[in-house]
Amino acid sequence: MKTIYQNITLLASFLLLFTSCGCEDEKIEKQPVNYTVLLDLSDRILVPQQLDKDFALIETTFKSFEKQARQNLVISSKDRFSIKIIPQKNSPLNVNHYEDLLQLYLDETEVAIKNKSLVSLSKTLPKILENLKKEALYGSTSNTYFGVDIWAYLHDNGMGLSKSGYENKIIILTDGYFDFESQAHVIQDKNQYTSTRFLNDLTTSNWKLISESQQYGLLPIQLDKNTKWIVAGISGKKSTDILQTEKITYFWEKWLKQSGVKRIGIILNSSKTDMSSKLSEQL
């Protein structure tokens, strides 16, 4: 009888331990998500419908953020959403104004107004983007727009875009070029540069073999290894080079990997619907 009692006690202990472990697993909280969209407003936006595509991707990202925030109670959400406009020389655009309007950090928002703030940005987002489009299109020719320094921006701010304790997702809306008006602005270390001008030297079908043997590429920087980076809108500028999109994709992936990134997504420039669908799958 004593043995039976001991066996029952032992079995009950195992069941209690198993149940406790299950409860602990359920208590493990999923990390909040930090969504950041980087916007390149260089002369690429003169391409018809380009900003419409960019803004569709921004709205897709916001919907993912909103869904994430509402998975549990909004009042307990710590998720973050923001748009960062890459600085551009001589641009009359009030960057700080739009960045303030296009961000919502629920971890820094008072509990009482979290839901109101989320609903408000959801309603006003299309209008804000419409106004941004009007002000961003301040010129009609490429000469009016200076190139944006993506390399310098990410060199200075890349690590700061990722927040500790979060699942970080950074989306860069760009054609993929690191172009400037003057080569004097470019830093070079052997065959690694801070611009993509070296693409002009890789014009043959064996460009990849040449780039690997001579170590062509972009100068690596330091980026958070756990952050997911998505580059959306990559597009070739030269109709005479049918391999240009492939080259840009190759060097972006190479650069991000050399900079420490493990998770990379690439979305080529296509229709608004197609790009939005692909982004939604990767978020």
Feature names for model-found ranges:
Residues 85, 114-122, 180, 187-188, ...:
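Scaffold/interface architecture of coatomer-like assemblies
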Residues 1-21:
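Sec-dependent bacterial lipoprotein signal peptides
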Residues 31-104, 108-165, 169-171:
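Von Willebrand factor
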Residues 197-283:
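Von Willebrand factor type A / integrin I
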